[in-house]
Structure formats: C-alpha cells, structure tokens
Design a protein with these regions (language model features):
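Donor nucleotide-activated moiety binding/catalytic core segment of transferases
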Residues: 229, 235, 240, 264, ...
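N-terminal pre-catalytic "stem/leader" segment of glycosyltransferase-like enzymes
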Residues: 1-140, 144-145, 428-460
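Eukaryotic intrinsically disordered and solvent-exposed regulatory patches
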Residues: 70-74, 126-129, 205-207, 254-259, ...
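Catalytic core of nucleotide-activated saccharide and alditol-phosphate transferases
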Residues: 110-265
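Extracellular/periplasmic catalytic domains that process cell-envelope and extracellular macromolecules
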Residues: 11, 77-83, 133-136, 262-266, ...
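Short, solvent-exposed loop/turn segments at secondary-structure junctions
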Residues: 24-25, 90-94, 145-149, 172-173, ...
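Catalytic binding pocket for nucleotide-activated donors in carbohydrate/polymer assembly enzymes
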Residues: 330-427
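Short catalytic/ligand-binding loop motif for oxyanion handling, primarily in non-cytosolic enzymes
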Residues: 3, 28, 93-98, 133, ...
C-alpha cells in the first residue's frame, strides 16, 4: 500500500477527509479570512481551499487533470475512507487580525486560546469520534508562523500537539533555535508570499514557457487587471494570464513570437535580494549578521546595517541587485532577469523569498541557511534541493560574489532547468495543487512507519 504510494512518480493513496464543519460560532468571520490574504502566514487558508474548493474557473484543469487536483484526488467526504483528518483551524489568521487591530503589537493574543482554539478543539473531540479513536495522531493542523504553536498557552498546545503539524519553519538546530520543531512529527510546507499569494503577480507574464525572460511583460501583467480579479482565491504560476484575443492582440502575438524565436533575452543580472537588516538591538540574532554584508556600512553598529565593519556592501556591485524593497511589478521584472536569488536568514532560517525565486526560475542561494545550516526544507525526500540551489556557509558569506561568479554556465543552466521543471511544484498555487500531493506522500510514509505523535509527545 504505502510502498506504492510513496514510490517516485506514483499517485499517493491516502485520502484527506475534511469532515469537520465547525459551527458558525467557531469559524472566523469572512471579513477576517479575506483580510488574511495579505498575511505572510496564509498558507493555512490556501491549503484548506485546495481541498474544499473546485479548481479555479480560469484553470485548464479539466478531465484527467481535474481528477488529479487535490479537491478530487485527496479528499473524501466519507470519514470511513479517510486516513487523515484536516482540522479547519486558522490561528495564524486570528492572530494576524488581532495584530492589525492592536497596531502590530505582536505580544497581543486577543484571547486566541480561550475564545478560539480551545473551544474548537473541544468541539472536535466531543462531536466526532475520530480524534479520540487515534489520540489525534491522524489529524492535521497547520501552524505557518515562525514559532509554530509557541504563541499559545500550555493548555492550548496540549490540546493540539498529539496531531501532525504542517509548519513553514523546520529547524533542527539545538535549543533555543529548534525548540518548536518536531523532526519526526511535523511536515515542512512552503510559505505563502506577498508577491504571488497576496498580489497574484503571475510569473508567466514575465517569463516564457521555458523560464526565460520575455522581451516585455505580457499585456496581462497589468496591476489594474489583478486588482479587478482580487476575488480569485488562487495565484497562477504555470500559464500566462488570459488576454483579449482580438485581431490586434493576435497580430501582436505573432510578431512577439517571431521576435522571441529570433532572440531569447538572457538573465543579465547575477543576483537579487529584497529585504531589510533588522534592528540595532538584534545583534546577530537577526540574520546571523549576514545581511549586514549586503548594504553599505560606515562601521557604526548603531546605524543600519548595524555592522562594526566598514564596507561598500554587495549593493555596490554592478551585477548585484540589492535593495530594501521594490514595487511589485518592478520586482517581478527584476526577478525575471536575474540568475540567482540570495536567501539569508531573518529571525528564523526560512525565507518566503525562496518561493518567489522558484516561481520565477531564479536559482536559490542559501547563505547560512539550508540543510547544511540545520534548516529542514519542504519535502526533502521528494525534491532535489541540492540539484537546484547553491549553499554557502555563514563563514563564507563574504565570498558570495566570487562564489557565484565561479559557477560555470553549464552548472547554472542545469540548476536553472531543475528549478523550472521541479522547483515550481513546491510553490503554493491553485491549478495543480502539487503541494498537497507532496504532503500526501509524506503522510503516506509516516503511516507506513507507524509514526504517531500520541498524547505523550509535547513541544518543550
């Protein structure tokens, strides 16, 4: 059974039953849920939609393709056929709404334990037999924030932690860094990103079917159009956005395609990074001090980038595109024209930039992060992270430019092609729902091995 479903290329057998229809008083208001689209933690909502909603109407997923979508292939309404049970609990969304109302005071909890999580977990235990039958071991809860379930009281955590967690931060370093990650119990999933999952910027409007940059973004890459389609629940990364197919458009496509066949633009920029440097009081707790190398420093540790060393920073290099931020469409254009994406840590080892890089065909560069640094990446048994990324240890972070320039064209192309053909499967999207298929494979392995958290395992 599980030897088949866990074999490469085989369709996983486990079904995920969304049998829990929480009563209205235990559901988050629709206004809160819609607001959480703008949260970096909304992977919990995206995973739920992939199971419970039909593929997007704009998708070409019909026939066999639709049958392979998680909504059809990995969900059953019959609990007797279910191997695992998905709990529609969204505490990250609850806290995001709480922090918005509190002016981003992230120590606020807005009674998330007593008002939301504990009543919902009590209902699941008392209204359904499935939790008690397994001690919760065959139940799935999503915890997409940096410190997993560390935001909640011990009583709340005890009510949840016999289940399998789907987490975005996998860290096997000694405490305190890896305190909340359970190596043999949790499954690491991708984070959502603002660029793709909030603003619905479509990479295929900036790169062609092979992952090479378009001479100009397609007409559908219009931010006004995306705002008009803001109600769509899913981003698109595999097909270009639909455009008007009138005569003028068809003629334009003909000449554009003719031009693209003559000359495919190359990625002209070597490396890209968008992000900040933390606070002066953070020291090396933020980014292990690595990001201070990216920006010019006057040697004053009290001013950004908070370094005691004087240097011009990678931002001064002509083939490094380093900045605090960019407008979304400008950032998308730059991603499409860049070879490598820098991935230093922040407060944790993971970075949402990774999934933007993969979606745009940019080769990720783990700097002080990645498996060699103690980071657990999503679906390591099924995804060849080594073959589509570069890993640079922290003590060689200052050598990033020379290391990247030493990579041969052939090696870069191998990694770029693997990113495009394999890496995009790890990005949260709605057309294919590959993330759920990868989750199912890992659940299959856990079931085969008899791994079950049980009430005796706690997050300490």
């Amino acid at each position: 059974y599980c030897e088949t479903c866990c074999s490469p290329g085989k369709r996983p057998d486990p079904k995920l039953a969304q049998v829990y229809d929480l009563p209205p008083d235990l559901r988050l208001p629709e206004k809160t849920v819609s607001q959480c689209r703008w949260s970096a933690y909304n992977s919990e909502l995206l995973l739920h939609r992939l199971l419970t909603e039909e593929p997007p109407a704009t998708s070409t997923a019909t026939g066999p393709a639709a049958a392979n979508h998680p909504h059809s292939s990995l969900r059953t309404l019959d609990p007797a056929k279910a191997d695992f049970f998905f709990v529609p609990l969204f505490p990250a969304c609850y806290l995001f709404d709480c922090w918005v109302k509190a002016g981003w005071k992230k120590t606020e909890r807005c009674n998330v334990d007593e008002s939301y999580i504990q009543p919902a977990m009590r209902h699941i235990r008392e209204a359904y037999p499935h939790w008690n039958a397994s001690g919760g071991a065959d139940h799935l809860l999503v915890h997409p924030m940096d410190y997993v379930d560390g935001y909640y009281t011990e009583e709340t955590r005890a009510a949840m932690n016999s289940s399998t967690y789907l987490v975005t931060v996998g860290d096997v370093r000694p405490a305190p860094y890896g305190s909340y990650f359970r190596s043999y119990r949790d499954i690491v999933i991708p984070s959502s990103t603002h660029l793709i999952n909030s603003y619905h910027v479509n990479p295929r409007d900036f790169v062609d079917a092979s992952g090479f940059p378009l001479p100009e973004p397609s007409g559908a890459a219009d931010p006004k159009r995306r705002l008009a389609e803001a109600a769509l629940p899913y981003p698109e990364i595999f097909e270009p956005s639909p455009t008007d197919v009138g005569l003028t458009t068809r003629i334009g496509r003909f000449f554009r395609d003719l031009f693209e066949r003559r000359s495919t633009p190359e990625r002209s920029m070597l490396a890209i990074f968008r992000g900040g440097w933390g606070e002066a009081t953070d020291g090396e707790a933020y980014s292990l001090g690595i990001r201070s190398l990216f920006f010019p420093s006057d040697g004053d540790p009290t001013t950004p980038p908070f370094s005691t060393a004087q240097h011009h920073g990678f931002a001064s290099l002509p083939d490094f595109d380093i900045a605090l931020w960019s407008e979304n469409d400008d950032y998308a254009r730059r991603l499409a024209s860049t070879k490598f994406g820098l991935g230093p840590p922040g407060y944790t080892l993971d970075t949402t930039r990774l999934y933007e890089y993969l979606a745009f065909g940019v080769v990720p560069v783990f700097i002080g992060t990645g498996p060699t640094a103690g980071q657990v990446l999503p679906f390591e048994r099924d995804v060849d992270w080594h073959g589509m990324s570069i890993s640079i240890p922290r003590d060689r972070a200052h050598q990033v430019p020379s290391i990247l320039r030493s990579i041969t064209a052939d090696e870069y192309e191998r990694k770029r092609k693997k990113v495009w053909e394999e890496g995009r499967r790890v990005v949260l999207e709605g057309r294919e729902g590959n993330v759920w298929k990868l989750i199912a494979r890992q659940l299959c392995r856990m079931k085969r091995l008899g791994v079950a958290a049980g009430p005796e395992i706690a997050n300490n």
